[in-house]
């Protein structure tokens, strides 16, 4: 079956227009453009399509073919093996010649043994109107089959008749061929914060201990900002209360010591020590000064400042450490001041209190009473060692 037998029943006596051989320009397709689906003037062909002999076809697959003997410049035709019995007819397309048009039915031949056969349908796009007398026929790449589930493609149609480069649309639009609904990923909900009840049930003993430590630190800070009286009552381990008693017309003060345990503080131990350091000393000092002055007036009359200071220091030491073996009294301190100091304690700034022997007597097993180091004067004529930092060798050559 040839083309003339197809065109003969369609041509009627009323349609006296004879279709002349029209050159057709087929542009090369581009894989990056989208060809729209079947619309007006488009029809699908299964594997290959047939056109008149004056229409040139350029295959985009570079298949070996044979040359045509047409009057136009030769182009490559794909090698086809057609069978007339397998021809399938499709709706006609319009061949435009000036202002007149002739309906032409085009069969679709099935490629049986060609190595360049295609399974997807092709689309032939013929414009409805043409400003030039020449016919324009666009040959497109195979589109994805509608029966298969293909995602999308973005290839615009080729509409340029003079240039072989495809015309790119400014906004290529994608087309979804998928028939199943697309399920978007749902956002993962953030875990809810633990409630108060659950957090109470999961608190461990270590958390309770840390909380008590924090509370202890807060209480120590509040103690620092409290008045001095409550301050001393909390931090100082020794509380002294003065009870005046009348004896021989002179008011004497007797100190009643009360031992009190320090409060249990889970915070750092430096809080109580820092509280002691920042405690105003005038209250405690004035009490001690008043008691010492009263005692001195009752017993021996006025004393020097140094002796009162020594007495005060001794009493403070006895109050702090009452279990000490040596009981310090005023007479001992007075004797210590008049007694000559040992050679070891002469060099010290605090002076010798004779409370402990020097290192030589201690090694010999002597106590502070039997210490004889005060008579052991250093020899002034002894040879002093020379330093070795000035280039002096230890041995002579």
Curated annotation (Swiss-Prot):
Bias kind Low complexity: ranges: 221-240
Keyword flag Transcription: yes
Biased composition (Polar residues): 285-309, 320-330
Biased composition (Basic residues): 383-397
Record carries keyword S-adenosyl-L-methionine: no
Any one GO biological process: regulation of transcription by RNA polymerase II
UniProt-annotated stretches for the region Disordered: 159-203, 221-397
Identification of the protein by name: Uncharacterized transcriptional regulatory protein C56F2.05c
């Amino acid at each position: 079956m040839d083309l003339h037998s197809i065109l003969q029943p369609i041509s009627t006596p009323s349609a006296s227009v004879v279709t002349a051989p029209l050159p057709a320009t087929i542009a090369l397709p581009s894989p990056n453009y989208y060809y729209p689906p079947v619309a007006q003037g488009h029809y699908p062909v299964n594997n290959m399509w047939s056109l008149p002999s004056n229409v040139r076809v350029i295959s985009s697959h570079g298949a070996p073919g044979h040359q045509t003997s047409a009057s136009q410049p030769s182009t490559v035709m794909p090698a086809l093996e057609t069978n007339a019995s397998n021809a399938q007819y499709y709706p006609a397309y319009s061949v435009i010649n000036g202002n007149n048009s002739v309906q032409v039915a085009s069969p679709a031949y099935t490629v049986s043994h060609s190595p360049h056969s295609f399974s997807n349908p092709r689309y032939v796009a013929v414009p409805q109107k043409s400003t030039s007398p020449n016919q324009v026929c666009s040959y497109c790449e195979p589109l994805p089959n509608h029966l298969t589930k293909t995602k999308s493609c973005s290839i615009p149609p080729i509409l340029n008749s003079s240039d072989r480069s495809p015309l790119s649309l400014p906004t290529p639009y994608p087309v979804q061929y998928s028939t199943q609904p697309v399920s978007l990923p749902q956002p993962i909900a953030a875990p809810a914060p633990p409630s108060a009840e659950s957090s109470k049930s999961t608190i461990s003993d270590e958390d309770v201990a840390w909380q008590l430590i924090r509370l202890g630190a807060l209480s120590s800070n509040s103690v620092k900002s409290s008045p001095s009286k409550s301050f001393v009552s909390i931090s100082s381990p020794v509380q002294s209360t003065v009870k005046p008693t009348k004896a021989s017309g002179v008011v004497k003060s007797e100190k009643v010591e009360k031992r009190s345990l320090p409060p249990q503080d889970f915070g750092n131990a430096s809080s109580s020590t820092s509280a002691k350091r920042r405690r105003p000393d005038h209250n405690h000092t004035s009490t001690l000064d008043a008691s010492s002055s009263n005692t001195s007036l009752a017993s021996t009359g006025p004393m020097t400042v140094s002796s009162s200071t020594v007495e005060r220091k001794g009493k403070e030491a006895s109050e702090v450490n009452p279990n000490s073996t040596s009981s310090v009294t005023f007479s001992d301190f007075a004797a210590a001041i008049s007694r000559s100091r040992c050679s070891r304690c002469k060099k010290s700034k605090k002076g010798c209190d004779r409370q402990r022997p020097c290192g030589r007597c201690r090694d010999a097993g002597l106590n502070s009473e039997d210490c004889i180091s005060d008579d052991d004067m250093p020899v002034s004529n002894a040879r002093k060692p020379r330093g070795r930092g000035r280039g002096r060798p230890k041995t002579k050559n």
